UniProtKB/Swiss-Prot annotation:
The lineage of its organism: Bacteria, Bacillati, Cyanobacteriota, Cyanophyceae, Synechococcales. GO terms for biological process: light-independent chlorophyll biosynthetic process; photosynthesis, dark reaction. Its cofactor is [4Fe-4S] cluster. This is Light-independent protochlorophyllide reductase subunit B. SUPFAM superfamilies: Helical backbone' metal receptor. Binds 1 [4Fe-4S] cluster per heterodimer. The cluster is bound at the heterodimer interface by residues from both subunits. The active site is at residue 291. It comes from Prochlorococcus marinus (strain MIT 9211). Its EC number is 1.3.7.7. Belongs to the ChlB/BchB/BchZ family. It is an enzyme of class 1 (oxidoreductase).
Length: 531
């Protein structure tokens, strides 16, 4: 067990709660102490839902441990069924309750209810939230389809042609607390409808148990989020013969590949590559336009969940012309795919759930843009580097009221804006910092609003805080001291590489035995490392 200030994923019962909250007619009875009820805030505060998650907690206390906690569990199950009348019941336990070993799932199944009861065994001390969500969805689908006839050898994805109807597919994987899932579903539905493909079921988001039961009526499955739906898609393919897509439609290139893949699975004529000319997404042309030329070659560090990291690395490298200098994920289930992607870029993938290790990797790689989670946003802010959030965990500001997908053509437009705008703002800040001594930025001079006059002050405008980096007093005594002249020269260097320049200059000064770093030492160090 590890004590940490921040964590990328919660325990697996949070993942189960995400599935239950995403669906209709499903209730989750969670055997947990009172302290584990904090999870409600994730949905009401972060996701901003209008109702509480459909979860009943047993909320046992220390004094209950001396009695029969099994009866406490059965009492709460009985109350939940009588009050909420669910169509399907999930029963599980939190990390704390796992130690008691009451086996609430077995207790629920022995109570004689006619509704489907899904017992969840989620190892809290070895697995995390995304795995818990995937396992819950998998067990729910298996449990509800256990009486459906298996038809692996008989299924034909092209049977829609002989039945005189349009092909239909399932969209699997979107859930609450996923990154822009709600808007992604709408965008993918719009694209598929444009190509004559109907949606059979979207699950778990917005689905009811009755929808899950008819999930095998589709011709194929679309796995939108492998962290949540891949295990379910594999099971459906093995038992019902339903093929599923492997390409995630995030970015222009991936969306084209996705359309080709789903057309091939369904036996449809491949679509024309009309999207390449920018008629569907503006990302392609914008990334080639004159105003965006300065973006080419910018160093970018990417970290987040596996799905969005893999998509972001492809977009950054192939569609925007960025140089990927760091790639990693906290999703151990996706570690192999991320390692393979990093290897293609000549990098070693960072697989960790320690946000401090990620921050250290950002420092070492000295990127000009960070694409990460809410935690990387904080780290990048401390380091003075522009950042865009591409993955959960996220802040409430990353759940916008507007339509803001990541997938499809409109998703590519959103991604371009979200990634490029921080770079533009960063460039503006750097230019203001470089020219802050010019007369336009001096308070004593008249502004462009001549009739209003300037500010009368004898003090020079104070530079932004990130230009006033000083050597920390806690540094060892052998570290060289920066003179005011050296600090002034350092401030002229772009903020996104200033940390690396400072470190290299101090290293050079130590090598030559220099105790004070002035402007000349800085230039000598630059020449030394560029030689």
């Amino acid at each position: 067990m590890e004590l940490t200030l921040w964590t990328y994923e919660g325990p697996p019962h949070i993942g189960a709660m995400r599935i239950a909250s995403s669906m209709k007619g499903v209730h989750y009875v969670l055997h947990a102490p009172q302290g584990d009820t904090y999870a409600d805030l994730l949905f009401t505060m972060i996701e901003r839902r209008g109702q509480r998650p459909p979860v009943t907690y047993t909320t046992f206390q220390a004094r209950d441990l001396g009695g029969d906690t099994a009866e406490l569990v059965k009492g709460h199950i009985r109350e939940a069924v009588d009050r909420f009348k669910p169509e399907a019941l999930l029963v599980g336990e939190s990390c704390t309750a796992e130690l008691i070993q009451d086996q609430p799932g077995s207790l629920a199944k022995g109570m004689g209810y006619e509704i489907p009861i899904i017992s969840l065994e989620l190892p809290a001390y070895s697995k995390k939230e995304n795995w818990g969500a995937a396992e819950t969805f998998y067990q729910l689908v298996r449990g509800l389809l256990k009486d459906s006839p298996k038809s692996e050898s008989e299924h034909n994805p092209s049977k829609w042609k002989t039945e005189g109807r349009r092909p239909r597919v399932n969209l699997l994987g979107p859930s609450l607390l996923g990154f822009r899932c709600r808007d992604d579903v709408l965008e993918v539905q719009k694209i598929l409808a444009h190509h004559g493909i109907d949606i059979n079921v979207v699950a778990p988001l917005g689905a009811a148990p009755a929808d899950i039961i008819r999930i095998n009526e589709a011709d194929a499955n679309i796995c939108l989020y492998p962290e949540i739906a891949e295990s379910t898609c594999i099971w459906l393919e093995r038992n019902f013969g339903h093929p599923y897509t492997k390409t995630i439609p995030i970015g222009v290139g991936a969306t084209n590949d996705f359309l080709n893949e789903i057309h091939q699975l369904l036996g449809m004529e491949l679509p024309k590559q009309e999207e390449e000319d920018g008629s569907q997404s503006r990302l392609t042309w914008y990334s080639k336009s004159v105003d965006s030329n300065y973006l080419t070659g910018k160093r970018v560090f990417i970290f987040g969940d596996g799905t969005h990291v893999l998509a972001a690395s492809r977009i950054a490298h192939k569609e925007l012309g960025f140089e990927v200098v760091g790639l990693g994920t906290y999703s151990r289930e996706m570690a192999r795919k991320v390692r393979d992607a990093a290897k293609e870029l000549g990098l070693e993938a960072l697989i960790t759930n320690d946000y401090l290790a990620v921050e250290e990797a950002i420092k070492e790689s000295a990127p000009e843009l960070v694409l990460g989670t809410q935690m990387e946003r904080h780290s990048a802010k401390r380091l003075g580097i522009p950042c865009a959030v591409i993955s959960t965990p996220m802040h409430v500001q990353d759940v916008p009221a507007r339509y803001s997908p990541q997938m499809g053509w409109e998703g590519a437009n959103v991604i371009f804006d979200d990634w490029v705008h921080p770079l533009m703002m960063g460039l503006e800040e750097h230019l203001i910092g470089m020219f802050r001594h010019d007369f336009e930025f001096t308070d004593g001079h008249q502004s462009h609003l001549g009739h209003l006059g300037g500010h009368s002050t004898e003090k020079e405008t104070k530079a932004p805080s990130f230009y006033q980096e000083k050597v920390q007093s806690s540094r060892p005594e052998h570290f060289p001291h920066w003179t005011p002249e050296g600090e002034s020269e350092l401030a002229k260097i772009p903020f996104f590489v200033r940390g690396k320049v400072r470190k290299n200059t101090e290293k050079y000064a130590n090598q030559i035995g220099c105790k004070e770093i002035d402007g000349e030492t800085l230039l000598d160090a630059k020449a030394h490392f560029n030689a």
